[in-house]
C-alpha cells in the first residue's frame, strides 16, 4: 500500500525512491510484523485468558503436558494479523503472488479457526470433523492450483525444478494442479502435526520462510536465475515481503511461545503457516526443496503414517508415541532438549536446501 504513496511522493523528493527496492521493504516488513507481535501479544494473551480459551490436552499424552492445560491457544491469530498488516503496508498489492499467499493464509486460517473454536469454546474435543477439515482444505488448494495453472504466463511457472541437476526442469502440464494440491495440503497438515511442543513448529517455519525469501529474490532477477539455473519468475521478488513478514511475525510469536509457553498458536496458526509455505514453494517452483528444508515437518508426518500403518497392519507400534517428538519425550528427554535439537536439524536442512542452488 505504502509503495504507491512513495511512488507518488518520489516526484517531489527523490529519496522516497528507496521504497521501490524490495530489499528495503522486506526489512521494514520484517520489523513491522515483529514489533506488532511484540506489542499486541501481551494484550491478546490477556484477552484469551479472560475468555478462557485454553489448550485442550489429551489424557493419553505425556504427563509433562498436563500442566499445559488452560494455556491460552489460538495465538496463530497474532501471527496472521502481523503478516497481513505488514504485507498490506509494504507489499505491492498489484502482485498476484502476494494475493495468492494471502488467500491461502486466510482460507486455511479460517479452517483452523473453526477447528480451534469447536475445541476450546464449544468444548468439542474432536474439533472440526476430519473429513470436513480435509474437504475444506482440498477446496482451497484446488482453487489456488487451478488459478495458478490457468494464469501461468511463462513456461517456468509450471516446470518442476529438480535439485542437484542442472537444467532438469520437466514441464508438468495438467499434473501441475495435482502437485500444487498435495504440496499445499501436505505442508499444512505437516506443520500442524509438528506443533506439539513449545516453539517446535514456529522456529523451523521461520527458518524455511527466511530461505524462501532468498530464493524468491533470486528467482525474480533474470541474471541470478540464469546463473543458478532456476526458473526466472518476473514479479516473484514481491514474495520476499511475504516471507520476511512471516519471519517477523513468527519471531514475535516465539517470544511468547518459547518454553514454557504463554500461548499456543493452535490450528489457526499451524494450518495457515504450513499452507503458506507450500504455496510459496509452488510459486517459486521449489516443491522438492520444501521437502528438504522442511525435513522436520516431513519427519513428524512420516512418523505418524508409519505408526498408524504399523498398528493397523501388525498390531504393533513403532514409536512409543507419534508424532515422533512425543517419542523422545517418553524416552526421558526434557522438552527443551527435544525442541532445540529439532531446531538444529531444521537449520542444517535449510542450509542443505540452499546449498542445492549451487550444487548442480
UniProtKB/Swiss-Prot annotation:
It catalyses: UDP-N-acetyl-alpha-D-muramoyl-L-alanyl-gamma-D-glutamyl-meso-2,6-diaminopimeloyl-D-alanyl-D-alanine + di-trans,octa-cis-undecaprenyl phosphate = di-trans,octa-cis-undecaprenyl diphospho-N-acetyl-alpha-D-muramoyl-L-alanyl-D-glutamyl-meso-2,6-diaminopimeloyl-D-alanyl-D-alanine + UMP. It is found in: Cell inner membrane. The keyword Cell wall biogenesis/degradation applies. GO terms for cellular component: plasma membrane. Signal peptide: none annotated. Pathway: Cell wall biogenesis; peptidoglycan biosynthesis. Its cofactor is Mg(2+). Pfam families: Glycos_transf_4, MraY_sig1. Keywords: Cell cycle, Cell division, Cell inner membrane, Cell membrane, Cell shape, Cell wall biogenesis/degradation, Magnesium, Membrane, Metal-binding, Peptidoglycan synthesis, Transferase, Transmembrane, Transmembrane helix. One of its GO terms (molecular function) is phospho-N-acetylmuramoyl-pentapeptide-transferase activity. One of its GO terms (biological process) is cell wall organization. It comes from the Bacteria. The chain crosses the membrane at residues 21-41, 74-94, 97-117, 135-155, 168-188, 199-219, 236-256, 263-283, 288-308, 338-358. It is an enzyme of class 2 (transferase). InterPro entries: Glycosyl_transferase_4 (IPR000715), PNAcMuramoyl-5peptid_Trfase (IPR003524), PNAcMuramoyl-5peptid_Trfase_CS (IPR018480). Catalyzes the initial step of the lipid cycle reactions in the biosynthesis of the cell wall peptidoglycan: transfers peptidoglycan precursor phospho-MurNAc-pentapeptide from UDP-MurNAc-pentapeptide onto the lipid carrier undecaprenyl phosphate, yielding undecaprenyl-pyrophosphoryl-MurNAc-pentapeptide, known as lipid I. Belongs to the glycosyltransferase 4 family. MraY subfamily. NCBIfam families: mraY. This is Phospho-N-acetylmuramoyl-pentapeptide-transferase.
